[in-house]
Amino acid sequence: AHAEMMIYPRILALAEVAWSAPSVKNYDDFHVRALKEVEALKAEGYHPFDLKNEIGNRPGADQPVQHLAVGKKVAYGPDPAYYPGYSAGGDSALVDGVIGGWTYGDRRWQGFIDKKRMDVTIDMEKETEIHSVGADFMQVCGPEVFMPSEVIISVSNDGKEFTELKRMEHKVVKDDKVTFINFGWEGNAKARYIRYQAS
């Protein structure tokens, strides 16, 4: 068992490095594929090193991230909220300080189905100096996990009238790469409510 743990998945990494052209090498993509291969090896009775416990270069995946919105109330709507199968812990998932790992299967990613818009409003409880707002998104085309094509970030003091801080358009390219993108805004604003929309 120890020899298997030393060999797998290192041999997968060796094959990836040796047989892939430099122009197509992508660690993030390899890591997600390796996680699936490790699960397949386990199912076959092998004892590979558990990559899920590896601390890679996804910052915050191994420990909570501190920010001003941690623990604040999040309202979803008016469209239906996240898909129940990918709730990532429910209504507080977006403000719990925990960042999703390398795969949507880690139960840390919140998923939204079809054309339904992600529309969340965070109540900071009082007027607050805001300098950045952002959210990470993952794309894995095989299981139809896609990036948003548009993101809008706005703020408000009354929760009714919102001022747009940033609107981002994104062309969704459907390929076999696993991709992570943070859609965010940086600047200076003062508000009680932060609204984040993605579709």
PLM region descriptions:
Residues 11, 133, 196:
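Hydrophobic, well-ordered secondary-structure elements that form the walls
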Residues 11, 157-159:
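Short loop segments at secondary-structure junctions
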Residues 161-163:
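Tryptophan-centered short beta-strand motifs
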Residues 57-130, 138-147, 157, 167-176:
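Disordered, acidic Ser/Thr/Pro-rich linker "stalks" and the adjacent N-terminal cap
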